[in-house]
Amino acid sequence: MKVTVVGGGSTYTPELVNGFLARIEQFPLDELWLLDIDEERLEVVGGFARRMVAAQGSPFKVILSTNQREAVQDAAYVTTQLRVGQMEARREDEYLGQRHGLIGQETTGVGGMAKALRTIPVILSIARDMQELAQPGAMLVNFTNPAGLVTQALSQYAPETPSVGVCNVPITAKMSILDRLTEATGKKIDPDLARLDTLGLNHLTWHRGFTIEEEDVWPQVMQSFLADLRAQEKPEWDPQTIAVLQMIPNYYLQYFYYTDKKLKSQEKWPPSRAEEVMEVEKGLLAQYADPALQEPPADLMKRGGAWYSTVATQLLNAHYNDLGEVHVVNIRNGRAIPEWPSDWVLEMPALVHKSGITPLPTRPLPPAQFGLIAQIKSYELLTVEAAVHGNRDAAYQALLAHPLGPTADKVQAVLDDMLAIHRPYLPQFWH
């Protein structure tokens, strides 16, 4: 079996390789293709990946490629973790926000929109090549941020290619809740027996339930979470907000709930998060280039993205082996929440079978959450239209619709700035 990783020169790749090595008995991988446009970086990361695999007795081949069509040919799965414009473009996205007095972030607000405009055409070209060249029914598993928005574009403009979006936030939340329960009870809990009930859009979810072997333990989780917040001098969340909601918000909701605080912290830049990551990556690539290194260094944790390889390889394994496991993914709503539009891509629990991934029927979120979801989904749908058609009016309306976007009198200035700084990666707007 062939699996292709688009953005194979990413510093995350060794973690993914580890995941495949750990599951080789159940997931019989023959060829892992690493595709990247940065040859130098691909050689470093790919060389390290090959040493990792060789150290485990070479259960599969690692093949490096800079040719997209060759890389997706005959693939059973294609995972996407690419970054159009690399880390320099992320830095531009962050400072675009700061320059205009807005949130400057990789996936949220104006930065997330800029990234989506650059990324969507590339992801759709991969889906088209898969339709023509990959194995029949090959699945595209997207990690590229903004993951929900990119998966929304795939669902609308490449519906014939099976696709799903994944993120490490739900599993990180699940593992953190398990740690909390273990601490309280002194008993280690098998993660496979636990299930997190979470719903929303990618980076805009609310965790609202937790079961262990189908027993509801959410009241204990909330009680413990609130007690922790109240004991802290500067808690991450205002305890009253959490007590009223009776849900735990996704970390990224801080940009919406505490916008002023987040804007203030941006004033300290440099370094922005992209600049911090660039330093971490420089160090990681130097370590990866060491011919003696055979397993991922501890510094990889500084890169962020905990549990990334677990999410990816567990999902592929569940799909390949028809396990019927429940995974939290970004997927088209369909009939899972009849009250919400069927064509919305949501982040929600879904059943993973070989025949496909099906969202589990679930109850909708209340108005306080739904209002924000509807607003962000409107922005997402407009951004998809803008990215696919190079439609400046749709891009203008997307900025206007976003609650973290500019006021109406500043939309044009922000849009002009965004399109100008990323002009080489946005040909659809400049024809």
Language model features: what each stretch is:
Residues 14, 139-213:
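Rossmann-fold dinucleotide-binding core
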